[in-house]
From Swiss-Prot:
Motif PTAP/PSAP motif: where in chain: 55-58
Keyword Protein biosynthesis on entry: no
Gene symbol of the encoding locus: M
UniProt protein name: Matrix protein
Membrane topology: Peripheral membrane protein
Species classification: Viruses, Riboviria, Orthornavirae, Negarnaviricota, Haploviricotina
Keyword annotations of the record: Host membrane, Host nucleus, Host-virus interaction, Membrane, Viral budding, Viral budding via the host ESCRT complexes, Viral matrix protein, Viral release from host cell, Virion
Recorded GO MF terms: structural constituent of virion
Organism, scientific name: Tibrogargan virus (strain CS132)
Domain notes: Late-budding domains (L domains) are short sequence motifs essential for viral particle budding. They recruit proteins of the host ESCRT machinery (Endosomal Sorting Complex Required for Transport) or ESCRT-associated proteins. M contains a PTAP/PSAP motif, which interacts with the UEV domain of TSG101.
């Protein structure tokens, strides 16, 4: 799991490293990634996105208002900041610049924003290399997994490939901060895991998972949890703060 990120970090190490650094080097690399907050304990890689090791769940039938959309998701988000990120509020303040900068297709917005927020809430910090402190702080994560998200049928995307790439620039504590987003959605006939299970993966220090509904609201999206699934639709007006699922067949979820 997270092999792509692990490999990416490892390649940044000096190519002149001796092959004789066997056991000690391997043990050190097991704690390379740290949790996003600088004052938190190191994060073991085995705790990061543990769900990727679990078997995929069967796809549920669609309700009368929402349909299951399934994609193979290949995604990565990286934040590069001169000033360190000290807490969750600072992180969300940086990540929220996408609210005004989203220019992707309307039909895939629920997917893009949900995946984006899932990664943002599970970012890890790249440590200093060989004890040398870098002039910038890098926070990143990503995954490659088949996932299912329930979308209002009036806004359901087509069964085709979608891609969203974005480089955003903002400031953090008066310093430049960049956000690099790469999300690919590939159509598949395979069964997917509920994205709710992904978003609610425990954080390493067991802190409370941010409320998904509150996280989505600034992006003009609304979500309803039903039978362990997220049902997502676009928020059409300022007074449109809830989802009516009364016409959905309870047995179909």
């Amino acid at each position: 799991m997270l092999s792509r990120i692990k490999q990416g970090i490892k390649t940044k190490r000096s190519s002149s490293s001796s092959s004789s650094r066997s056991k000690t080097g391997d043990e050190d690399s097991s704690l390379m990634l740290r949790w996003v907050y600088d004052n938190d304990p190191p994060l073991k890689q085995t705790d990061t996105f543990q769900y990727l090791m679990a078997p995929t769940a069967p796809t549920d039938k669609a309700s009368s208002s929402y349909i299951a959309t399934t994609y193979k998701v290949d995604c990565k988000v990286e934040i590069i900041s001169r000033a360190s990120i000290r807490n969750f509020d600072e992180l969300i303040n940086i990540a929220s610049c996408l609210i005004d900068s989203y220019d992707g297709q309307l039909l895939i917005k629920p997917w893009i924003i949900t995946v984006y927020l899932t990664i943002i809430t599970h970012l890890v910090k790249e440590p200093d290399t060989h004890g040398v402190r870098s002039s910038v702080n890098r926070y990143h994560n990503g995954f490659n997994e088949i996932l299912t998200l329930y979308i209002n049928k009036n806004f359901a995307p087509e069964n085709k490939k979608y891609s969203f790439k974005k480089n955003l620039s903002t400031t953090h504590k008066g310093n430049q901060c960049n956000i690099i987003i790469s999300i690919d959605l590939l159509p598949t006939d395979r069964k997917g895991k509920s994205i709710k299970d992904v978003y609610e993966v425990k954080m390493p220090d067991n802190r409370e998972i941010p409320n998904f509904q509150q996280m989505l609201k600034p992006y003009n999206l609304k979500v309803k949890e039903k039978n362990g699934k997220y049902l997502i639709s676009h928020k059409m007006s300022s007074s449109d703060d809830s989802i009516d699922v009364s016409d959905s067949d309870e047995n179909e979820f």
